[in-house]
Curated annotation (Swiss-Prot):
Its main location: cytoplasm. ATP binds at K579. This is Leucine--tRNA ligase. Keywords: Aminoacyl-tRNA synthetase, ATP-binding, Cytoplasm, Ligase, Nucleotide-binding, Protein biosynthesis. One of its GO terms (molecular function) is aminoacyl-tRNA deacylase activity. A motif ('HIGH' region) lies at residues 40-51. It is found in: Cytoplasm. SUPFAM superfamilies: Anticodon-binding domain of a subclass of class I aminoacyl-tRNA synthetases, Nucleotidylyl transferase, ValRS/IleRS/LeuRS editing domain. It catalyses: tRNA(Leu) + L-leucine + ATP = L-leucyl-tRNA(Leu) + AMP + diphosphate. Its EC number is 6.1.1.4. GO terms for biological process: leucyl-tRNA aminoacylation. InterPro entries: aa-tRNA-synth_I_CS, aa-tRNA-synth_Ia, Leu-tRNA-ligase, Leu_tRNA-synth_edit, M/V/L/I-tRNA-synth_anticd-bd, Methionyl/Leucyl_tRNA_Synth, Rossmann-like_a/b/a_fold, tRNAsynth_Ia_anticodon-bd. One of its GO terms (cellular component) is cytosol. The gene is leuS.
Length: 804
């Protein structure tokens, strides 16, 4: 008889709900474990089979840690602000609140049906005013610390949509949605000074138990480089062009400068002869996103401004060009081009027939740029020096002339924080008519997002909130001064920057969270989620956490001690699952046909947790067959416990049981769930080979199965005669002495040829080994009629007989 998953799973989900089995109490002295999932955006599509992979992994660990006596925090919530809900509202005229609420209900039902052990009393929702009150409060702390400021930033402005788009929303100069033209336009935006924390964000990565590849992604994103700031005087002008270079030693080879089309000097230095060309080029560049402009594969373009600069060390005149591959937002928005020793500059110089001056020997600059090491040539006082020495000397020479200095540069830019959207947290700032601005008093938080039917863009570059006079216009009660509320909203990243803190104390109305509770639970011990959040979410959350640490609000420097990225589940043909391909698998269907336990087991058994693996119906069926085998081993047709399970131990399963406990325990610690499941299968196969199974061993097995397949785990535990839930039962232990065999297999050779393999007791003496070998029938046949010259016995290994 196979088990009825629909009945059993519903029964135990109801039991857990009614008994609040997974409710977490803040037992502040107890050893703790905080297991966190990246909370989902509740889209209209509901859960897909990719979601449960990470969720199952953290759930297994949470259940395992509870059984080890840990106080476990394992919460779930909703990252519910963001563009898709607003887009839906625009397209249908429905309120994004209703849409979001409905989606959350669907997600929650699906998640509960998968048997995850979340404490639902700690659920958070980023769109709940009681939650975003504290998101706004954190913004005010950032503002007071000088880390939030207004700046004029070049943004992707789409007049047809009446809004600013992110770089990801612009493709080939048009909007991803609707294909409308997009232009680069300077607009006032809120920016967060993440660059102030660049060095800390970089240095503290070393202490984290994160995948090295992910740490490298953050290191590259921060992009710290050491070099020099160099100043070039513009010929016949007061202007100076400042560049940052990591290779000041190559300055004698700088044969032209390239400015970004938006550089502040371009208009003033361009000569009349080149004005029209420069203007036309600037217009074209404004239609491209930064990603397109810096694409290495694209053909280089640029125009000469007619102006020249003076090389501060050689005194030579060099041309000043503009080109879109130089961005105004990186470094100084200008570069010194050394075509002999840089591939991109070489390509540009060849295309526009600009001078190529070799300053490091070792290559052939007629054919290609030389980017290797070597002695300096054609470089004045730097001649004969190798790279490092030349860099130091070049900086000294520049400093002496007042034309440069040593400098550290970062690729990381400050974080553009405002969005011209409705469905986000209002930024708690008021702009007064006298030109000042203040934050909303903390006691007035939350500043509520007003309800409105008019979500369409304002058309002015402000958010739809600008259309709501009752929200926008304010008067200071004390002075009578008029003001306008900030109409931009926060990005979706804001709510997800700190949600792991709110889970610790979700109902606290007086503070973000109780300091004692924060001290108990932080840092997060295990954080599992997709690698697509490697940079933005994880970097932003680390930044906010460090600010809160400096303010004395959180007790740790870092939020997430161990981080793990689960792999992607692909469609059957190894393709990414997508609606358009029609290969998306809905977990609801699997729960119905195979059961939640089967889905959980299968997703953990597919392969290593971090690998990308194709979905397979056969694999799913195989996982179900294993659970049926477990059920049949333990449960009779009539639902009673099998008589095969006995209270006496005939020792036949001693070794495999103890091996299983050891292997599963070790594999759970390293998230090696696929190999842990293989070992559980080995144990069940051995149980089928014997007549009797020792009850404590099968109980230990059920405890190990329960974190992976909790519904069948609970049901079998109750069949074994237990009334209480398996959730807090102690994790099984193993006996080292029983892991080893008392028997070994030895080989017997005659004149170097293998003649027999024999099992003997481990402590057999050399003399006994010789006797056993010589009495073996195969060996007897091999030495018949021969004289035995010598017998060599190596304990536990072999017996070698030399016969003539």
């Amino acid at each position: 008889m196979n088990y009825n998953h629909n009945q059993i799973e519903k029964k135990w989900q109801d039991y857990w709900d009614e008994n609040k089995t997974f409710k977490t109490n803040d037992n502040l002295g107890q050893k703790k474990f905080y297991a966190l999932d990246m909370f989902p955006y509740p889209s209209g599509a509901g859960l897909h089979v990719g979601h449960p992979e990470g969720y199952t992994a953290t759930d297994i660990i949470s259940r395992y840690k509870r059984m080890q006596g840990y106080n476990v925090l394992h919460p779930m919530g909703w990252d519910a602000f963001g563009l898709p809900a607003e887009q839906y509202a625009l397209d249908t005229g429905n309120d994004p609140r209703e849409f979001t609420k409905k989606n959350i209900q669907t997600f929650k039902r699906q998640i509960k049906e998968l048997g995850f052990s979340y404490d639902w009393d700690r659920e958070v929702n980023t769109t709940d005013p009681e939650y975003y009150k504290w998101t706004q409060w954190i913004f005010i702390q950032l503002y007071n610390k000088g880390l939030a400021y207004v700046d004029e930033v070049a943004v992707n402005w789409c007049p047809a949509l009446g809004t600013v788009l992110s770089n990801e929303e612009v493709i080939d100069g048009v909007s991803e949605r609707g294909g409308h033209p997009v232009y680069r336009k300077p607009m006032k935006q809120w920016v967060l000074k993440i660059t102030e924390y660049a060095d800390q964000l970089l240095a503290d990565l070393d202490d984290l138990d994160w995948p090295e590849s992910l740490k490298d992604m953050q290191r590259n994103w921060i992009g710290r480089s050491e070099g020099a700031k160099v100043s070039f005087d513009v010929d016949n002008s007061e202007g100076k062009v400042e560049v940052f270079t990591t290779r000041p030693d190559t300055i004698y080879g700088a044969s032209f400068l390239v400015l970004s089309p938006e550089h502040a000097l371009v208009d003033s230095i361009t000569t009349d002869e080149y004005k029209d060309q420069v203007k036309a080029y600037q217009t074209e560049a404004s239609k491209k996103s930064d990603l397109e402009r810096t694409d290495l594969a694209k053909d280089k373009s640029g125009v000469f401004t007619g102006a020249y600069a003076i090389n501060p060390l050689s005194g030579e005149k060099v041309q000043i060009w503009i080109a879109d591959y130089v961005l105004s937002t990186y470094g100084t928005g200008a570069i010194m081009a050394v075509p002999a020793h840089d591939d991109r500059d070489y390509e540009f110089a060849k295309k526009f027939d600009l001078p190529i001056i070799e300053v490091i020997e070792g290559g052939n600059v007629e054919e290609a740029a030389y980017t290797g090491e070597g002695k300096h040539i054609n470089s004045g006082e730097l001649d004969g020096l190798e790279n490092e020495a030349a860099i130091t000397k070049a900086i000294q020479l520049l400093e002496k002339k007042g034309a440069g200095e040593k400098k550290v540069n970062y690729k990381l830019r400050d974080w553009l924080f405002s969005r011209q959207r409705y469905w986000g947290e209002p930024i708690p700032v008021i702009h007064w008519e006298d030109g000042t601005m203040t934050t909303v008093p903390e006691e007035e938080l939350p500043l509520l997002l007003p309800e409105t039917d008019e979500i369409k863009p304002s058309g002015t570059g402000e958010s739809p909130l600008a259309n709501i006079d009752s929200f926008v216009n304010v008067v200071d009660e004390k002075t009578g001064m008029k003001g306008r509320r900030e109409t931009n909203t926060m990005p979706q990243w804001a709510g997800s920057c700190w949600y792991y803190l709110r889970y610790i104390d979700p109902k606290n109305e007086n503070m973000l969270a109780d300091p004692e509770k924060l001290k108990h639970w932080l840092p997060v011990d295990l954080y599992i989620g997709g690698v697509e959040h490697a940079v933005l979410h994880l970097l932003y959350a680390r930044f906010w956490h460090k600010v809160l640490y400096d303010l004395g609000i959180v007790p740790t420097k870092e939020p997430f001690q161990k981080l793990f990225n689960q792999g992607m589940i692909l469609g059957e043909g190894n393709e990414k699952m997508s609606k358009s391909k029609g290969n998306v698998i809905n977990p609801d269907d699997i729960v119905q046909s195979h059961g939640a336990d089967t889905l959980r087991l299968y997703e953990m058994f597919m392969g290593p947790l971090d690998a990308a693996i194709a979905w397979s119906e056969k694999g799913l069926d195989g996982s179900r067959r294993f659970l049926d085998r477990v059920w049949r081993l333990m449960v009779n047709e009539d639902g009673t416990l099998s008589s095969k399970i006995v209270t006496t131990n005939n020792k036949s399963l001693d070794k495999v049981y103890n091996q299983t406990v050891k292997k599963v325990t070790e594999d759970f610690e390293t998230l090696g769930f696929n190999t842990a499941i293989s070992q559980l299968m080995v144990f069940i196969n051995e149980c089928y080979k014997v007549d009797e199974v020792y009850k404590p061993y099968i109980e230990g097995f059920v405890k190990m199965l329960a974190p992976i397949a909790p519904h069948i785990g609970e049901e079998l535990w109750s069949k074994l005669g237990h009334e209480e839930s398996i959730t807090y039962q102690p994790w099984p232990t193993y006996d080292e002495a029983l892991l080893v065999d008392d028997e070994v297999e030895i080989v017997v050779q005659v004149n170097g040829k293998l003649r027999a393999k024999i099992k003997i007791a481990k402590d057999t003496s050399k003399e006994e080994m010789q006797e056993i070998a010589l009495s073996n029938d195969n060996v007897k046949a091999s030495i018949e009629g021969k004289d035995i010259m010598k017998v060599i016995a190596v304990p536990q290994k072999l017996v070698n007989i030399v016969a003539k």
